[in-house]
Amino acid sequence: KAWRGRLAQLEGIARFTHIEVLQASERLVLVFRVLKKLTDKDRASLLIWATELDIDIYIRPDDEQPITAINETISPLTHTVLGHDLTIHPDYFVQVNAAVNQLMVAKAQEWLAPDAGSRVWDLFAGHGNFSVPLAQNSIVDAVEVSDEMVAAIEFHSKQLCRDAATSTGKLIAHKKNLSDRDSLNS
């Protein structure tokens, strides 16, 4: 929380609409949404913070442009879900409360109770928060509309295959337009 006290030092504080805070398994990440381009002084200040506080800082200009890292060296981020390390990006939707997330995923597994013969569909699967743990023992069809999320699920599927000694399931990524009924039949 040391970063909070430094906000007043920024000359362009009015340029920020909000700050997203992401606590990944191993790092703290701040994503600053900005209305206008950062001043060179503020950019330099944020870079110093990132180094001194050992955090990752990203800038999100608007919804049309991708977020960019202030730091030159950004480590991959992960969050752990029921023993599975899932690689994430600050743009991904992640449940902010890790304990609540663990409970939600465990409850989904309890309700569905998938076994080796089960096939589960995870609609709007995101990066695989529910899909990967469910695929430990069953076949999971993870359906997404976003190319980036499909790629994330495919990446996690490959990880699951490498862990085949502890997994009897399978994770399959599908890109579908979920508002198109015909898309679901293909």
Language model segments and positions:
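Extended interfacial segments that mediate partner engagement and assembly in macromolecular machines
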Residues: 1-16, 23-27
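Short glycine-rich, acidic/polar surface loops and turns
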Residues: 17-18, 74
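Well-ordered beta-strand positions
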Residues: 20-22, 80
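Short amphipathic alpha-helical segments
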Residues: 28-30, 138
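Accessory substrate-recognition/RNA-binding modules or partner subunits associated with SAM-dependent
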Residues: 30-31, 61
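Short beta-strand-to-loop capping motifs
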Residues: 32-36
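Rossmann-like S-adenosyl-L-methionine
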Residues: 37-186
